[in-house]
Amino acid sequence: MAANKSYKSYFLDPLWGNNQPLIAILGICSALAVTTTVNTAITMGLAVSFVTGCSSFFVSLLRKATPDSVRMITQLIIISLFVIVIDQFLKAFFFTISKTLSVFVGLIITNCIVMGRAESLARNVPPIPAFLDGLASGLGYGWVLVTVSIVREFFGFGTILGLQLIPKCFYASETHPDGYENFGLMVLAPSAFFLLGIMIWGVNILRSKKAKR
């Protein structure tokens, strides 16, 4: 497999052509909780990129020394190690965001993308391609989260990255009862699934049109 693909392909393919949330429909559950604001979406995307890239690298590095009978346990231990590292890093240097994300950083270990890349690719290719694939899979997951979070934060709160984009004077008040009001549905968890569904639908249309050419 490694001989047939360049490093560039290993990195670029998961960003779009084999994007895990949009193509494989993996890792979408966390979109419910972490896409309310762009800050949390970026943080979760980077955290998953770190865990997936590093765990894929070490799964690949140890692939020849790991018996098939214990490979899943070994992969889980490796993934858990890097989840703990990123969790402690966020608590030490980005406590506010860590508190906002709460248990969802720890739940990265249950993210299907992380185990999926380790099992389907990392144990079959050398460490560098495995790392590039894992890193890009996390980044591909990240940009999907950020896209969803931009829509949710803008319409739900009128902000992006905490910056007020919709002027306060536009909002409804006692003197202007007919003014703008935030779209409350976007703050609710189901809105993330609606937006992801629209994105998946759009990607499938683009892929089908490309296939017909």
From Swiss-Prot:
Coding gene? nqrD
Task: State its location(s).
Answer: Cell inner membrane
Name of one Pfam family that matches: Rnf-Nqr
User: Can you name the source organism?
Assistant: Chlamydia caviae (strain ATCC VR-813 / DSM 19441 / 03DC25 / GPIC) (Chlamydophila caviae)
InterPro entries named in the record? NqrD, NqrDE/RnfAE
Name the HAMAP family on file: NqrD
Q: How does it assemble?
A: Composed of six subunits; NqrA, NqrB, NqrC, NqrD, NqrE and NqrF.
* Protein name stated in the entry: Na(+)-translocating NADH-quinone reductase subunit D
- Source organism, top-level taxon: Bacteria
What residue intervals traverse the membrane? 21-41, 42-62, 69-86, 101-121, 131-151, 183-203
Q: What is its EC number?
A: 7.2.1.1
What's its membrane topology? Multi-pass membrane protein
Q: What is the top EC class of this enzyme, as a single word?
A: translocase
Q: Which family does it belong to?
A: Belongs to the NqrDE/RnfAE family.
